[in-house]
Amino acid sequence: MEIKRDAYLQQLIERKDNGMIKVITGIRRCGKSFLLFTIFKRYLLENGIGSDHIIEIALDGIENEELRDPKMCFKYIKDAVKDDGKYYLLLDEVQFMPRFEEVLNSLLRMSNIDVYVTGSNSRFLSSDIVTEFRGRGDEIRIYPLSFAEFYSVYDGDYDDAWDDYMIYGGSVSYTH
């Protein structure tokens, strides 16, 4: 069963195509990657965006290690854009790339790319993250699961769910 994070999806939808970098922040394991790569991607596909116009990069995976290089990543993204249609860049764990701010600001100069990034280190959790993009960033802060969200996918009774929630908190990883 999938946890619904409709409020966060709605925030992404409201900011779609606004010309700013959507910066999704939150502590580790709170569901940022799932929100971006599963829930938001599904929304894009269901609303007519072709999979060939969605560019997904997870920088924490070894398979994308070479894309941690700023110039390689920028070239990869630029080469993935094949026409004048709108493209959606979903870039996970951007803090793995040195000088990521330069890459993101360069991408903003390409009018047909809508940029979404996640990050979870202390730099991304600070209130200064949006200012790093010189007024071109839009932060969406993700929180751990509420008890209602946790219980909606919990396999057990209410009291056991409450006990586990009090022990483990709202970590998305516990519910899987």
Go through the PLM ranges and name each one.
Residues 1-174:
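Phosphate-binding site recognition
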